[in-house]
Amino acid sequence: MLNTQISKSTLAKLLATENISVEYRKVQTASFDIVNRRLTLPIMNDTTPEMTDLLVGHEVGHALDTPQSYVESAKAGGSAFSTFLNVVEDARVERRMKDRYPGLRKPMAIAYRQFTERDFFGIKGQDVNAMMLIDRINLHFKLGAIAGIKFNAEEMSYVNEVEKADSFEQVKDITERLYAFCKAELDQKRQEAKEEFEKRKENGEFDDEDFGDDIFGGDDTEDYEDKNPNDYDSNGSDDGDEDFESEDQFDNGYSNTPTFEQAMPNELKVYGDEVKSVTDEKFQQALNT
């Protein structure tokens, strides 16, 4: 273990072409302190050699190419915006690292496949092509062709810009426009989903088979045939429950028709109220657990 740590520390310094400080600590993921020039690597037993090479190469890429203004821009934009900034900047620094050191290409590609197999991006069972553009861009640049990502002509223009971004100023410009594009994209997808929901609702397409009683946490109606007769008073009512004034009152309280939020496609639910890169967020969370 010690020999491996020493060799990886030496590798990091050689790649960075400067005497950066390299520390192994009980942290969950690798990180680079842009201001203090300190690379922190985790003490992990379940990572593969390729994963370690990826983490080292990735953070050294930030050491070489990411300016201190990155931190300021991320803070100013907020947490959701910072996921966009991270996706675009990651694509730039990893491309530049692989150009500098072609030997990193293979282990980085293998490592991202291994992370995907462990579902670090949170895409298992998801239709990746139904996700927001920012997430498709993230998967495209990190996983390559195996992700099977599709783009239309307008989206492809953003992909090409990310591919060619050479400076952090270009990254900021692309990120700001991409963020605005995805906000509009999410609004449009939600509107389309809502219109489809209303159409299905009018056609009576929602039934027990689609949603059932699970919406309400189970069937609240009781099988009175199985109850003890002593549980009822002389009028045949259950003292423990309030009487329903009518059958309509019962029906109105327990409709099986879902709300739009319940019927919303999973690919939209994951974004919540604010557009963000859920794949970047999931990856960071997975590294920290």
Locations of the language-model features?
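Short, functionally important secondary-structure microenvironments
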Residues: 1-289
